Design a protein with these regions (language model features):
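Nucleotidyltransferase catalytic core that binds NTPs
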Residues: 1-185
Length: 185
């Protein structure tokens, strides 16, 4: 029986922190499947920086030098906004019926996990693998049973929103420089 990790997220954009999580999880699991999602249920009005296809291209490029047991699956590309984590877990349970599934989520998502749609059913099909960062392995307050993936205090403190804001700022600066915008006033 293989251990299969499902690592889903909006990944807008996918960054070095996400890659580190996938690499660390791949050390404990037989396979890690990165699953970019179509929408963010907790921030439905959030601004999108990249299209789904662009996110897939970025992830594919970033995992090209990662261990071979890290792959990407774009199953959510053609799904509507009603597609949820439970649907993704069910899909992979059908693909890997005799294997053990792990749903890889961050500590922030884990704290809200009991509010997820059909979270009890998710737990029947998959073990949660919670990415824990910080100074101590004992910091995680358990809200539901889970396995911990301790990244450590030297974990790259990156977030998609920080990366997105930096990209937008740099792109805007490039645009303004190219357009000679400042000299028009």
């Amino acid at each position: 029986m293989a251990k299969i990790g499902i690592f889903g997220g909006t990944f807008d954009p996918f960054h070095q922190g996400h890659l580190k999580i996938a690499v660390e999880a791949a050390k404990k699991l037989d396979k890690v499947i990165i699953v970019p999602t179509i929408c963010d249920y907790y921030r439905p009005d959030s601004r999108k920086l990249f299209t789904f296809d662009e996110k897939v291209a970025i992830i594919t490029k970033m995992i090209s030098n990662a261990p071979g047991n890290i792959v990407i699956d774009s199953l959510e590309k053609d799904k509507d906004s009603m597609w949820r984590t439970i649907n993704t877990v069910q899909y992979f349970k059908e693909q890997y019926p005799n294997d053990e599934l792990y749903l890889i989520i961050g500590e922030d998502s884990y704290k809200n996990f009991p509010t997820w749609f059909r979270y009890e059913d998710i737990l029947l099909m998959a073990t949660l693998m919670v990415v824990q960062r910080g100074n101590s392995k004992d910091d995680l307050v358990k809200v539901v049973p889970c396995e911990e993936l301790y990244i450590g205090k030297d974990f790259l403190e990156a977030s998609s929103s920080k990366v997105r804001n930096k990209l937008i700022s740099e792109l805007m600066e490039m645009y303004l420089d190219d357009a000679d915008w400042y000299n028009k006033f």
